[in-house]
C-alpha cells in the first residue's frame, strides 16, 4: 500500500479521495466478476441504489 503525505487540514479531503478511489475499484471488480443478464443486472442496480437511499 502506498503512503500519502497530507498537509494539516487536508486529512478529510484525502479520506474522501481514498474512499472514492476504493469505491471505483470495488465497482470495477464487481462489474467484471461475472455476467448477468440485463434484467437481473437492473434488479441488482435498483437494490443497491435503494440501500443508499434509505439513509
From Swiss-Prot:
The keyword Ribonucleoprotein applies. One of its GO terms (cellular component) is ribosome. The keyword Ribonucleoprotein applies. Coiled coil: none annotated. GO terms for biological process: translation. Keywords: Ribonucleoprotein, Ribosomal protein. GO terms for molecular function: structural constituent of ribosome. Belongs to the bacterial ribosomal protein bS21 family. NCBIfam families: S21p. This is Small ribosomal subunit protein bS21. It comes from Ureaplasma parvum serovar 3 (strain ATCC 700970).
Amino acid at each position: 500500500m502506498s503512503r500519502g503525505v497530507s498537509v494539516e487540514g487536508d486529512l478529510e479531503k484525502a479520506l474522501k479521495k481514498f474512499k472514492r478511489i476504493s469505491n471505483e475499484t470495488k465497482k470495477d471488480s464487481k462489474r467484471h466478476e461475472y455476467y448477468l443478464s440485463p434484467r437481473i443486472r437492473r434488479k441488482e442496480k435498483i437494490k443497491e441504489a435503494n440501500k443508499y437511499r434509505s439513509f
